Amino acid sequence: MTSPRKTHPLAKIINESFIDLPTPSNISSWWNFGSLLGTCLIIQITTGLFLAMHYTPDTSTAFSSVAHITRDVNYGWMIRYMHANGASMFFVCLFLHIGRGLYYGSFLFLKTWNIGTILLLTTMATAFMGYVLPWGQMSFWGATVITNLLSAIPYIGSDLVQWIWGGFSVDKATLTRFFTFHFISPFIIAALATIHLLFLHETGSSNPSGMTSDPDKITFHPYYTAKDILGLIFLLLALMSLTLFMPDLLTDPDNYTLANPLNTPPHIKPEWYFLFAYAILRSIPNKLGGVLALVLSILILMVIPMLHLSKQQSMMFRPITQTLFWTLAADLLTLTWIGGQPVEYPFVTIGQTASIMYFFIIVTLMPLSASIENKLLKW
């Protein structure tokens, strides 16, 4: 008799996605990040749900409600810091997941890749709105500065900003709607992640060699479930170490001061995971140009499949492109550092150079190195 696991309508879907899924036998730990991202999402939804039970989205009580959660709610401090640092872990996994996709040519699965890019944008929007909710100084001014960027859009810009604010400045209406969207967004992310998985299972996973793995597949369970659990242990170890020993390591001290529209912080900056894009935005003196560069720094991911000229999918056997890839990684780290520095010499010059390098490597140098490597194959 066939197992109900393979015949029951619901169990069958789970079975084909996580148990009997044919998986390449040679995928490395770089393929762990998909399941880790799923875990991060579950952690964020769970902790967020408990935080929402005690949080009040009102300008007069938001800040004190967060203090109340931290001080008076049972394990409220832990839930709050797990949520805040969970977002950081989420983005670490996201960036590594995208990096793996770039390195091993996973972007050639167009549908999966494009849904993934939309997922990245949605996650960034969700994290930004979440950063506004504690209603500290950096929350308020971050919201003001970032939403104000939309005013650079010709004709409709200023109307659009006021529409998002729900008034003439970031105020009660803004906080309420940000809380509403921040609450619903993770469920949209979960739906998009399901579609992402659906498209991935249409083609199957890539593998480090970049060659077809059809003749050599193994079942996902028990091999990769065990491997994923190891990654999960490391993720939880990192998250709980941050939460229990250094909960404020990645947060801004300014956010422990109540939002004050009359007092601007000396240096407005977003959370660390947005700093690379923020540095690109600041490196262009023109407002509209900066906003375009900011948007393109993310949307360029959708163009990468069209810039792929190599005859090989993976970078595993392409030393020139490998060098460029790691230069790009170093460039992104430089941009992240610059985004957290004040707007003065030499940081401005370094930021402008790193921003030019970012686009130049992706748009020009990588396709060029692919062409050179194609020619070298004929030797």
UniProtKB/Swiss-Prot annotation:
Keywords: Electron transport, Heme, Iron, Membrane, Metal-binding, Mitochondrion, Mitochondrion inner membrane, Respiratory chain, Transmembrane, Transmembrane helix, Transport, Ubiquinone. A ubiquinone binds at H201. Binds 2 heme b groups non-covalently. One of its GO terms (cellular component) is respiratory chain complex III. The keyword GTP-binding does not apply. It is a multi-pass membrane protein. Heme b b566 binds at H97, H196. It is found in: Mitochondrion inner membrane. The chain crosses the membrane at residues 33-53, 77-98, 113-133, 178-198, 226-246, 288-308, 320-340, 347-367. Signal peptide: none annotated. PROSITE patterns: CYTB_CTER, CYTB_NTER. Its main location: mitochondrion. It holds the Pfam family Cytochrome_B. One of its GO terms (biological process) is mitochondrial electron transport, ubiquinol to cytochrome c. The cytochrome bc1 complex contains 11 subunits: 3 respiratory subunits (MT-CYB, CYC1 and UQCRFS1), 2 core proteins (UQCRC1 and UQCRC2) and 6 low-molecular weight proteins (UQCRH/QCR6, UQCRB/QCR7, UQCRQ/QCR8, UQCR10/QCR9, UQCR11/QCR10 and a cleavage product of UQCRFS1). This cytochrome bc1 complex then forms a dimer. Heme 1 (or BL or b562) is low-potential and absorbs at about 562 nm, and heme 2 (or BH or b566) is high-potential and absorbs at about 566 nm. Belongs to the cytochrome b family. This is Cytochrome b. The gene is MT-CYB.
